């Protein structure tokens, strides 16, 4: 199979937004207009193509990032008449599935940020925007739902500037809002676009309506000033009053969008089929191709030397696995982005994280959950492979004779856990295997065994996250399970630096055991996890025993010294030690490492940490006092408030332990009229009284 379009004609984009901003409907319309669909699906009737899991069809929300590909020939602009390939990832907007957004942004070259014209910039819009900033992803903004009562394009543009700190530049302004939304004014061409009342594929180009001419001129000047500010040649022409051509405006807009100094803003109503084709033109016109993004940086797995891979078919193959999924028909699917080279079905790749060589059985071009077999993939492509057994999310796969490790993905630790057991004893093994498969797919889902009770615990990013995974157990793996009440995933850390000697000696006939280590433990910045430094000099501990010390420390960190919770953000340095030529072993040093760490942690001012959530409540004004009083009673700290879309909003930081059952309480205190969103913010020290109560609980449990 030859390359269908040149690399500079490829766009890898994501569609990202707050829940219910219309992402899936917009993607459906894109697929319809690009010829991938012959009938449009609607989210509200469960017929949307991109929402392919049973739970997504029932709930009307997108949980996994479905990937698809389509082709588009722009009608206007510098790229008009040229066929382009657009690979699209439709990402979830619910905060419990932030990991899906994170991993798709990692492999994309651009994004369409959707905003609801009524709700404006909502909490999850901010979260997703920050994630896109982290990866430097160029964006265009599409203000959707212009047909809804209360729609306000200009308020949304203002909110993008104020709440997201971005530089939004409208390229269109709406003709009518709400029920009378008919189309828009194209500010580059200064023409009106009025849609016909069919499927939206036809429209009339008209002169700008008389009552909008002054406003259109004002916004065009605003656009020209914005593009002139980022280009000296254009600025000179603008100041001299010379005419600036349409081609010049588009070229400078493209450069500024790729640098994320300007966010082009468009408007439409995907549901009413208005604006989507012009948004596709903008995707091609302003978002990056793999050529614009340039070389990807990595390092050699053995020498650690930096390695760069150009986005060219002639380069050695390098790709990044960004998602694992289980398909009922073909088994394990590994979604990957090709950064360089060509990969053929049936060939071998090296996984540089495991050092193992694996064979690519088949390569599939995914269209939501449908698929077609293809012979090979080229630089810039996104596809799915069948046959990779040990590849995990974030692993690099590459040409075995030219190894490279691309930058890994970092995922947040789970904040909530529940006990789970099968309804029937016969399903015990099946439950274990099914949970392992789900954990392989989702890096923020963890499975562990409580050492004291023997219970299986599952941990995730929120109640909905775990609820859907338990639901998948039943639907996909035919395992029915009972689950306990949600528990907070507490953590522990230390506040002081301490040195401590860990010694393990056993003499009881036969071969003895001996290991002695001197450890220094010190606190790390929040979010840094764990760091182990080997500072041994002069061979006082043989090299082969040092990994065992590290393993012993990590084993001890799983059960902290305050209340038995995992410890985090700690640096451990192995300073000194002793060994015995006959009695020393890996096991002895592992135990010595564990003893040394526990002893040091007890003296290093250990503290208990709890997850703090960023909570935003949107409520009618008459319930504002009740909402604020209730948040304060939950140990919440009010951080700000304001007005949006005719309602009041309150931003606060609240411990997760105080938020269980909040949706029911909020519903009853506001007669169902308020809603809220919540996302993990950070870990913070638990108040002393609560920490002491949890310690007592642990002591009494140990005595039982």
From Swiss-Prot:
Residues binding GTP are: 17-24, 90-94, 144-147
- HAMAP family referenced in this protein's UniProt entry, alphabetically: EF_G_EF_2_B
**Which keywords, in A-to-Z order, does the entry hold?**
Cytoplasm, Elongation factor, GTP-binding, Nucleotide-binding, Protein biosynthesis
Single GO molecular function: translation elongation factor activity
Originating gene: fusA
Organism listed in the record: Chlorobium limicola (strain DSM 245 / NBRC 103803 / 6330)
Record flagged with keyword Transport: no
Coarsely, its chief localization is: cytoplasm
Q: Where in the cell is it found?
A: Cytoplasm
Q: Which Pfam families match?
A: EFG_C, EFG_III, EFG_IV, GTP_EFTU, GTP_EFTU_D2
Q: Under which name does UniProt file this protein? A: Elongation factor G
GO biological process: what's one of them? ribosome disassembly
Give yes or no: UniProt keyword Chaperone: no
Please give an example of a GO cellular component term from this record. cytoplasm
Q: Which family does it belong to?
A: Belongs to the TRAFAC class translation factor GTPase superfamily. Classic translation factor GTPase family. EF-G/EF-2 subfamily.
Taking every annotated instance into account, which residue ranges of this chain make up the domain tr-type G?
8-291
Say what the protein does: Catalyzes the GTP-dependent ribosomal translocation step during translation elongation. During this step, the ribosome changes from the pre-translocational (PRE) to the post-translocational (POST) state as the newly formed A-site-bound peptidyl-tRNA and P-site-bound deacylated tRNA move to the P and E sites, respectively. Catalyzes the coordinated movement of the two tRNA molecules, the mRNA and conformational changes in the ribosome.
Q: Where is the signal peptide?
A: none
Disulfide pairs?
none
What is the phylogenetic placement of the source species in the record?
A: Bacteria, Pseudomonadati, Chlorobiota, Chlorobiia, Chlorobiales
